[in-house]
A protein has these predicted regions:
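Long, contiguous bundles of hydrophobic transmembrane helices that form the permeation core
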Residues: 223-272
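Juxtamembrane inter-helical linkers in multi-pass membrane proteins
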Residues: 136-171, 243-261, 304-312, 334, ...
Length: 428
């Protein structure tokens, strides 16, 4: 009985991983060119990475230390916004509030999101000192050895652990024109499936009520497990048929000293912050506008909405992830919010509905929703590549929607792998 209790999620997870690969197979450009041995290796790598992260004791210690640093940065940033904006930025309240009204005083744009500026400044400083560059180079070398990807793609993929859709391609800018179609698709997919070191801290802040002190460990784990998933799914949808592109780290920091690096990073963080706010307002407003139009079309008591339609699409995916039947609709709705709007809104909603979900489902969804795979990110993706490689516009525009589908499959696979071992691994 006890063995069956632990065995069923593993079997369901294997079925789920096979299901996601089958979906990718259905939209593959060249099914005969798929190298199934590499696909299988990618699936095994996801499981191995997760087990290593949670079974090797010092891994947990490292992530707890990182989490402590992030918590300190969060408190320092909140102190700074309190100084600048007063109580609306997290400073002392000049009036009394009831406990029920306390939550309404949380202003996302002025209290949680400014953490982006702090981490961007720190990341810029670490890049100038060469610390971040060495980490990225090491990851690129590791990916090349394990997954047999070209050196340029290895650096590009590993860069996405720390950088975003628009920043990571700059690390291999001289090689972008030379990338094969499969490599370009993989780079686009990892940009949408991944997140950034800057935003990881923001995830931890928003999910503090769900993840507690294990927040940073789970967020980083979700990002790392997604990397082999990206290579797996991308190689199914757009198999490699050309010679891989070699390359090395080519990014040079434009600052001439540490102070300038810190300043440039802070301003860059400000641009990212403004971009997040603008995109959230624009996308949420557009979705609400379309929803109001769809509300005019109804069948009896059934009213249409973009999120509602996407919820129906997501229900089979959350089943493949291993979400119980009685929680599938809520989970699918959260995934739909993540794709239609963004993961920040979905994480906020998760905090509201979490009492209707069991802890395992909560964690599966956290892993599945980590990443930039949403409609607005396609605009950022196309805008970035349009500036960097305008000569390949027709190619990356055509691949962009497939990259979004692939990214959703990849993050869903991360949630599936987590669900397979939930309750077995000690740190969960």
């Amino acid at each position: 009985m006890q063995l069956g209790h632990y065995l069923f999620p593993v079997v369901h997870g294997i079925v789920g991983l096979a299901g996601f690969c089958f979906i990718a197979f259905l939209i593959s450009e060249n099914r005969r060119a798929i190298r199934w041995r590499q696909v299988f290796a990618g699936l095994i790598a996801q499981i191995v990475i997760l087990l290593m992260l949670f079974l090797i004791p010092w891994f947990a210690d490292v992530f707890m230390a990182i989490n402590a640093v992030v918590q300190t940065l969060m408190r320092a940033t909140l102190d700074a916004t309190g100084v600048v904006f007063g109580y609306i930025g997290g400073g002392s309240l000049p009036f009394a509030v009831t406990p029920t009204g306390q939550s309404s005083l949380m202003i996302l744009a002025l209290q949680a999101l400014p953490l982006v500026i702090t981490i961007a400044a720190l990341a810029s400083l670490l890049t100038y000192w060469g610390v971040l560059n060495k980490v990225v180079q090491g990851m690129g070398w590791l990916l090349k050895r394990i997954f047999d990807v070209g050196g340029a793609l290895g650096v590009g993929v590993s860069s996405n652990i720390f950088l975003g859709v628009s920043e990571a391609p700059l690390m291999i800018r001289p090689y972008l024109k030379q990338l094969t179609r499969s490599e370009l698709f993989t780079l686009m997919t990892v940009g949408l499936a991944g997140t950034t070191g800057t935003v990881m801290g923001l995830y931890v802040a928003i999910l503090s009520g769900v993840l507690g002190k294990m927040g940073m460990m789970h967020v980083i784990s979700a990002v790392l497990v997604t990397i082999p998933a990206v290579i797996t799914i991308a190689r199914i949808i757009v198999p490699e048929v050309d010679e891989m592109t070699e390359g090395r780290l080519a990014h040079q920091h434009e600052a001439s000293n540490s102070v300038e690096a810190l300043t440039l990073g802070a301003f860059e963080g400000g641009k990212i912050l403004l971009g997040i706010i603008v995109m959230m307002i624009g996308v949420v407003a557009l979705v609400k506008f379309i929803d109001k139009g769809l509300a005019l079309v109804h069948f009896g008591d059934l009213h249409l909405s973009m999120t509602g339609i996407m919820t129906w699409v997501m229900e089979p995916l959350v089943w493949l992830m291993g979400v119980p039947g009685n929680q599938m609709h809520i989970a699918a709705n959260l995934m739909a919010s993540k794709v239609v709007i963004n993961e920040l809104v979905a994480f906020e909603k998760l905090g509201v509905v979490r009492h209707s979900l069991d802890p395992r489902t909560e964690l599966i969804l956290v892993y599945a929703m980590c990443g930039f795979s949403n409609f607005s990110s396609i605009g950022i993706l196309i805008g970035t590549y349009n500036a960097l490689i305008p000569g390949r516009r027709a190619e990356y525009v055509k691949l962009s929607f497939k990259a979004l589908i692939a990214a959703v499959l990849c993050t869903s696979m991360s949630g599936t792998v987590l669900g397979m071992f939930y309750g077995v691994l000690p740190s969960m």
